[in-house]
Amino acid sequence: STKLVIDPVTRIEGHGKVTVHLDDNNNVVDAHLHVVEF
């Protein structure tokens, strides 16, 4: 499986990160948007 991380995500308030997990056929298994506001 593959893990794709986009960090930092811009144009939002706070600090954001996107994590996408792909299976062996490059299909999305799980995706998360993490936002931490200060």
Curated annotation (Swiss-Prot):
<dbReference type="InterPro" id="IPR029014">
    <property type="entry name" value="NiFe-Hase_large"/>
</dbReference>
<keyword id="KW-0560">Oxidoreductase</keyword>
<keyword id="KW-0520">NAD</keyword>
<dbReference type="GO" id="GO:0005737">
    <property type="term" value="C:cytoplasm"/>
</dbReference>
<keyword id="KW-0479">Metal-binding</keyword>
<dbReference type="GO" id="GO:0047985">
    <property type="term" value="F:hydrogen dehydrogenase activity"/>
</dbReference>
<dbReference type="GO" id="GO:0046872">
    <property type="term" value="F:metal ion binding"/>
</dbReference>
<protein>
    <recommendedName>
        <fullName>NAD-reducing hydrogenase HoxS subunit beta</fullName>
        <ecNumber>1.12.1.2</ecNumber>
    </recommendedName>
</protein>
<comment type="subunit">
    <text>Tetramer of an alpha and a gamma subunits (flavin-containing dimer), and a delta and a nickel-containing beta subunits (hydrogenase dimer).</text>
</comment>
<keyword id="KW-0533">Nickel</keyword>
<keyword id="KW-0614">Plasmid</keyword>
<comment type="similarity">
    <text>Belongs to the [NiFe]/[NiFeSe] hydrogenase large subunit family.</text>
</comment>
<keyword id="KW-0963">Cytoplasm</keyword>
